[in-house]
Each structure stands twice: as C-alpha cells, then as structure tokens.
Amino acid sequence: MLDIKLILKNKDFVISKLKQRSNFNVSEIEKLYTLGTERANILISLSELQSKRNEISSKIGEAKRNKTDALFFMDEVENIKKELSILEEKSTKIENKIQELISFIPNIPLDDVPFGKDDTDNVILKEFPKIGRGLVKAKKPHYEIGVEKDLIDFSRGAKLSGSRFIVYKNAGAKLIRALESFMLDTHEKNGYSEIMPPFLVNSKMMYGTGQLPKFKEDLFKIEGHDLYLIPTAEVPVTNLFNNEIIDLEKNSKFSSFTNCFRSEAGSAGRDTKGIIRLHQFNKVELVEFASEQKSLRAFNSVLKNAKYLLELLEIPYREVLLCTGDLGFSSRKTIDLELWLPSEQRYREVSSVSYFGDFQSRRSMIRYRDENKNTQYVHTINGSGLAIDRVLAAILEQYQNDDGSISVPKVLIPYLNVEKI
C-alpha cells in the first residue's frame, strides 16, 4: 500500500500519477488527505495534552511532598484523561478508515512506464521471432493434437470439476513434470532457493500481496474457513517473511512450483478452447527481495532468468512493457514475456515480471536493516518462470512434425528420455 505520509506531503503528485491508471477515482486521494490531515491534528492535540498531564502530575507530586492541597490538580488530570480518551478513540476510528481506504489505492507507476488506456497501448520492446523453428504455423492446435495423442482429457476434467479444468495423461503429464523440473533446476543454477509452500493461505497473506480486498471475486475461498486457494506462488513465498525483519544476504531469491487457482471472473467467453486459461494451472514463480538501491537490478534479474528459459526451450517470444492503464494493482512496472502460439498466429503472455517497490512490504510488514542498522521496507519483485501450461501448448504446436509426431525440446530430453512423442 502507499505511505499515507506521501499523500500528505505530495498529494498533487500522487493524484497526477494515479490519474494515468484506468478507471481510478482520484477523489479517494482527497478523502485520504482530509482524513490524514485530521488525524495529524489530533496527534498534535494528544501530544500537547499528554505534556500538560505530565506537567500537572509533577505538580501533584510536589504538592504531596509539601503536604499542600493537590485536589485541584487531581481534578484537572482527570479532565485531561477524559479528553485524551475521546481523542484516542477518534484517532483510532480515523486510522481504521484510512487503512480501509488506502487498501484500495493502487501503486504509483514508475516514470518510465508509458501512458496508455489499455493493453492496446502497451509497448513492444524486443522481438525474438527466429528462435528455434521461428514463427511457424501449427498443423493442428494444441487442444486437438493433445487429445489425439492422449495427452490431455478435456471431457473427464469437466466431468470431475466443471469447465476450465483438465486432466493431463501419459506423456502430457510427463511433459508437465519435465517442465517443472527443468525450470526449477535452471533457476537453482542461477542462485534461486526452492520453496514448496502450502496451496492454501489465510486472508492476511492475501492482503499482504494485494489480492485482498480488491480482487476477492477472482479467488477461490474455502467455505467456513479463513483460507483461500493461492492464485500464484507469489502469495505464500512473499509472505514467508510477513511481519519479519529479514537478512537480505541470506533471503533474497526464491523459486517455487505450485498449482494455481483463479476463478477468472470477468473472463467468460475468452479462451474457452485449450489450456490457455484454466481455473487450475501449473506455474513456477520467481520472487526476489531487495533494498531500494538494488531493486531494479533484481527486476532485471527476474526478467533475464524468465527469458533464459524460453531461449533454452527455443520458443519465439517478445518483451512487452505494460502501459499505465494495463498495469496491475500492486505493480510500479511490469514487462510481459509473450511466446508465439502458432495456432492463433499471435503472441500470448507466459510471464509477467513486476516491480512493486515497497507496496507489498508495507502491507505485509517485511523489513530489513540497512547499513546503519535502521529498519527499512524491502522492495519486492516477482515474475512467472514460467506458466507451464502455456509453455506446453506452445511446444505441442511449435514442435509438430510432418509425420504427426511432436519433437521434444532438446533441454527436456534428459527428463523424458525420448526425443519424440
């Protein structure tokens, strides 16, 4: 979340930056400014009353030592206590209202994020169309060849759980496992520590990374419990250090494979065929913690490692810088990696690498000690490394051969022990 002090000191700056986001009501900042100013004035009054109470209390002590009447001073202290109680209650109510409002305020885009209304205004930074077989045309879409080769069972997935659920079978299941292992092994070689977290977390953790309260409808909640299925490993891995002071020398780079669960509210009718948009999907996530000074270096590190996987898999891709109108709620800057999907003859997102500044760490109280031993909020960065189901879809289409077989990417052969499917 934003620092209320920033809003109080630079209200016009905050408004001008958040105006660049789509559908943001800047009147919320005005409300926060009014509440913050009112609370600041109350805190001044509280401080003055506390000083006055202490001063009078010393007079009471002096009167008792001199064996003179202290009743007047004692009555005055009681009156001050009543005033303090009223002001403290008022301050608490205002603070609660501030926290409620500020929980819905998105992050401030960095200056190098382009202005735009939606994804049509995103900026293509680089394209790598000649990797592997290049921008080929698929002989068959992944959902057809996946069924023909008995790799994916859509009908039984729907029977078990409903639409947007699938069953991987035989070499399909093995490919998912191979991709998971390949990605985690590669990240480990590049300095990431592997985490296997719970797939269920409580609402405090969802709040910490920015999913709650704003995106409640996108989540699967366990009825009767304060537990949610994770939409991404970002949630549990970031919150490993919720309300902690961490050592950035020991805890800074993590990778995690998890199943992810999203209700896809608002996505009705989109990507209804295939494995591009599922309620349950597989993903490896990269999370880095850094000081402010090293945060953009960490952002580039996550981006580099996600790109490296696509290069090893020899899948054409491009880098896309998201504009202000398409930027995620918690993000200050995001670069998407999009792989080539032959059946659609277009690029599809396979990783979003995002820099959050201290937005998440303020919500989740993750801090570190700087060189002067002062506590500071860490800066957080994460990105998919990679979305496995979408990578599988690209492989099934990109690596089709004339004889109907599917070649296995070279880097996956050691995991599958076959060259073709």
UniProtKB/Swiss-Prot annotation:
Alphabetical list of SUPFAM superfamilies matching this protein: Class II aaRS and biotin synthetases, tRNA-binding arm
Q: What's the Enzyme Commission number for this chain?
A: 6.1.1.11
The GO molecular function terms of this record are: ATP binding; serine-tRNA ligase activity
Supply the PROSITE patterns for this chain.
Answer: AA_TRNA_LIGASE_II
Write out the residues that bind L-serine.
T232, A233, E234, E285, S384
Keyword terms, alphabetized: Aminoacyl-tRNA synthetase, ATP-binding, Cytoplasm, Ligase, Nucleotide-binding, Protein biosynthesis
Question: Whom does it interact with, and what assembly results?
Answer: Homodimer. The tRNA molecule binds across the dimer.
Please report the name of this protein according to its UniProt entry. Serine--tRNA ligase
Q: Which organism is it from?
A: Mycoplasma mobile (strain ATCC 43663 / 163K / NCTC 11711)
Gene name per UniProt:
serS
